[in-house]
Regions:
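Conserved catalytic-core motifs of GNAT/GCN5-like acyltransferases
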Residues: 69, 116-119, 131, 136-153, ...
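A short beta-loop-alpha structural element at the N-terminal edge
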Residues: 1-13
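Conserved acetyl-CoA-binding loop-helix of GNAT-fold acetyltransferases
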Residues: 86, 92-105, 124, 128-132
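Acidic/histidine-enriched, glycine/proline-rich intrinsically disordered or flexible terminal extensions
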Residues: 163-170
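Conserved GNAT-fold acetyl-CoA-binding loop/helix
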Residues: 10, 14-43
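Glycine-rich acetyl-CoA-binding "A-motif" of GNAT/NAT acetyltransferases
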Residues: 60-64, 125, 151
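Acetyl-CoA-dependent GNAT
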Residues: 33-89, 100-101, 160-162
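Conserved GNAT acetyl-CoA-binding A-motif
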Residues: 107-119
Length: 170
């Protein structure tokens, strides 16, 4: 089931996130992060009123999703960039898809216009999952990162939502 993240979920989130760092190009980071890092991340998300949701079964966090500001400048305030991570032992069970759909629903409910996903161009599974729910490729930055002895291309996918009825510049 999906629910809002609680502080006591952070140890399991840490494990999922560090697996993505160490074993994939889903995160362009080299070293595992600490629990203190995830606590600071959690507090920052709360301060920014950004959601963190988790998929939990039998008190085990199997995946999580979040979004945050796409860029810090005010004219971007209707655009968010999201992340979805699933524990490797629970992939292929539809958890990522459910988390993705829920984070989109939350963005829509908050009046967002655009949801962005930055996806490593070689991550075909994630790209297909995003396309399946309506994301379209909006561009690729070639050689955006370097990890595991090779240059990485970062593809951006976007989903356009209805957005606010009366957008403002403030």
């Amino acid at each position: 089931m999906i629910r809002n993240c609680r502080r006591d979920d952070l140890q399991m989130i840490l494990h999922i996130y560090n697996d993505a760092i160490v074993n994939s190009t889903a995160v362009y980071h080299y070293e595992p992060v600490t629990l203190e890092n995830r606590v600071a991340w959690y507090e920052e998300k709360k301060e920014q009123d950004c959601p963190i949701i988790v998929w939990v079964e039998d008190d085990v966090v199997m995946g999580f999703a979040t979004f945050g500001p796409f860029r810090p400048w005010p004219a971007y305030h209707y655009t968010v960039e999201h992340s979805v991570y699933v524990h490797p032992g629970y992939r292929g069970k539809g958890i990522g898809n459910k988390l993705l759909k829920e984070i989109i629903r939350i963005a829509e409910a908050r009046g967002m216009k655009t949801v962005i996903g930055g996806i490593d161009a070689s991550n075909v599974t994630s790209i297909r999952a995003h396309e399946k729910v309506g994301f379209v490729h909006s561009g690729t930055i070639r050689n955006a990162g370097y990890k595991f002895g090779k240059w990485l291309d970062l593809s951006f996918y976007q989903l356009d939502l209805e957005g606010p009825a009366s957008p403002t510049e403030g």
